[in-house]
Every structure is written in C-alpha cells, then in structure tokens.
Amino acid sequence: MELEKKEILVSEFEREETMTTTNKLKFIIPSIVGLFLFLIPLNYGGKWTIGVGILAETAQGITADYLPAFMVAVLLLSVVLTIAANVAKPQWIMNSAFLKGLFHVSGFWLVMRAAGALFAVMVIFEIGPAFIWDAYTGGTVLYELVPVLTKWFLFAGLLMPLLLEFGLMDFIGTSLRKVMRPLFRLPGRSSIDAVASWMGSGTVGVLITTKQYEEGFYTKREAAVIATNFSVASIAFSLVVISFIGLDYMFIPFYLTVIVAGLIAAIICPRIPPLSRKADTYYEGAGKQISEEVPEGKTSRQWALERAVATASKVKSVKGVATKGFQNVLDIWFGLIPLVMALGTIALIVAEYTSIFTYLSYPFVPILELLRIPEAQAAAPALLVGFADMFLPAVVGSGIESELTRFVIAAVSMTQLIYMSEIGILLLRSKIPLSLLDLVIVFFQRTIITLPIIVFMAHVFFF
C-alpha cells in the first residue's frame, strides 16, 4: 500500500502522544550508538576506521587461524540447504518467509553456490588445477577477501538496525533533503549510505542501500544510483592502496583527487543511461514508505525530529530488532559469500591467466598518451582490471616507474567503485534492478568521466 494511504500525518493530539520523553530517548540513544559505530571516524592501530571496523579488526586477531575453514563449512552448508529447499522442500524452510527466500532460489544461484563451495574446498586442500587455488586467484578470495567480508558483515549486519530502525535515517534524510535532492536527485537519507562507505566499507554502504530499497525508502532509480555512485572506497582501504604503490606520502592530495572526481561522476552518471532510465517506482513488496517533504508551518529540524521519533516509537521489542540483525548476517553468510567465492575466483582467474583485460585496454593507450601519461602501454590494463577486483589495479601498476602514472591508476581505481569480486556480486544478488550489462556500462562511464579529471588534477596541482 502506498504511503499516502497509511502515512502518519501527525495531528496535534497524535503528536503529543508520539513526542514523549520515552520515545525521544528511544530515538536518541540507539541513534547515537549507531552514529558512533558506523559514521564517526576513529583512529585505531594507526589508521582511520569506524567502530564496526574496530570490532572486525579485533575479531580478525582472534579468529584469523580458523576463519577460512569455518567459512568453507558455511559454504558447504549453504549448498546442502539450498538443494534441500529446492528438492525435498522441508516445512521448516518453506514455512519461514526468511529461510524460503534465502534457500529456495533459482537454478543459476544454486550452481553459483555449488561452485563457490567447490572452489573453497579446492583452495583449502590445494587440490585440482593450480590456477583455481593459487595465491593470486582462489587463495586471495578465501584467505583475504572472504575473512574480511565475514567479519565486517557479522558486525554491520547485527548492528545495522541501530541506523535503520530508530529514526536516524528519517532525521538526517529530512535535514539534508535540500542538499541531496537538487544536487544528486536523491533523498537526504542517501548521505548515510555514502558516509558509512567512506568511513567504513563500500559493501556496508551497499547493504544499507539494499535494505532501504527493500523497505520502500528508495525508488528503483534512486537505489541503483546510490549503489553505483555512493558506495565509495573507505579511507582505510584508500590508505592501503596508496601505500602499496609507494605513494603514501601523497595521501592527502590523492584522496582529495578521489573525492573531487567521485563527486563529479556522481552528478553526471545518474543523469545518463542506464541509470537515468530506471523507473522512479518503489519496490513492489513495500510500496512508498518515505516522506521527507516538510509540511507548512514546520521547520526542517522540527519535522525531522517528529519523523525520527515517530519511527522510533514503532519499535516494540529488542527481540524484533535483534532478529532483523541476525537475519542480515545469515543472508550475507549463506547467500552472498558463496557468490563472492565463485565469481571472485573466476574474475581473478580471468585477470591473472588470460589477456582479456589487456586486449580490452588497447583503446585506452592512445587516450593515455594524449593525456601525457608516461608508460601508457603498461598503464592501460590497470584501468580495466579493477572490474574484477578493486585492488588489482594497484597490483598491476605497482611495477610502473612513473609516480604520476601510479597516482592516476590508484585514483581511478578508487572512483570506479564497481568490481565483481565484491560490490558487483552484492548488487546482482540484491533486488535492486541492476543487470551485469548495467554494471559494465556504469564502470566504463565512471572510468571515462573520472580519468581526465584525475589526470588534470595530477598534472596541475601535484606533479
């Protein structure tokens, strides 16, 4: 049902009943905790991260030795339960809307989960063709990528209701609507997705966007735009990349360049196909649930607080919130991680053992030469391998002698945003209407838009 039919238009009496001290505290306390965990930058271990990142790093130290083996078991269990749901159809799965949605999937996703489990077993036991389990393909996914995602999504999934369920999104969304709507054609609450990505992890930003879309707060177009343009690389990951290519002393100009290029791309990309052609309709299972317009006679701050407290007042039990968080984690572990293992391994095999990206990069060589980029022939493939994994451009470009070229490669890789080993798979599995072709097109659009901006800033200001 559309929001207009069920929206709480607060009368004075209803407003007094809603705006109680208890409900205000129900909004304020969880929201402050959510802000601290997801949006406030903290220096930990010599690098900037967020509260959820600190929890993930702590878990890394405790579970590093056995986490890959644990996740192999999870991947195998995912396949077994998916087969059971599609063949035997046990009542305990089929009678649960959540479990049925998680395990009763199409044949394609069943094959992908099986492939992910198979690759994981091959990697951990080092059996089968070496190109599948070596350190640069399946080994990278199982021992480096999967543990990071497992830990991040454990804490992000469990704690995300603090951001979404207690009114913080309503408060910030209404407050920032006048900025986000004219500049990016997006709701004000989309700023939360961007900041969570910026301070924490791009995958956390996508997860927030997915949940908001499925709950009726973003249209199809808005969700597609936010997921492909605002799931930015975190400050922590940017530090890793710039350090890996030997330019850590240039981090400030590097990240400034990434921000400028990323903002320009975020303004342009949503206004051209395919993103501009996505329907401005809401997810059918939820309908429209958002209302950021400020009524006459109220200030933005007053209405933001009323909307936030009204949302918080709907939370009736801790158990319900905890259940949502637990379901978030199960959905990621059993639904997404197998796909990361399968498609991530395949993408890295293509990047490491074939010349596909080299051939595809040939048109970029004259462009780089025109832009006066040294070692253009060596740099061109680095502009494209980022579609497989965001860290690959740094690996490919690390051997290039020119600091200018390495700077450009690293900055472009940070602004492309779409890479199949992680973000791409998360988007394809979500209900956001983005196809593989859409992701390919947006990846090239962002590359073409940001490359000249990054080169210009590098030439004029830094080199």
Curated annotation (Swiss-Prot):
Family annotation (InterPro entries): Gate_dom
Domain of life, per lineage: Bacteria
Protein name, entry field: Uncharacterized protein BpOF4_10220
Organism the protein comes from: Alkalihalophilus pseudofirmus (strain ATCC BAA-2126 / JCM 17055 / OF4)
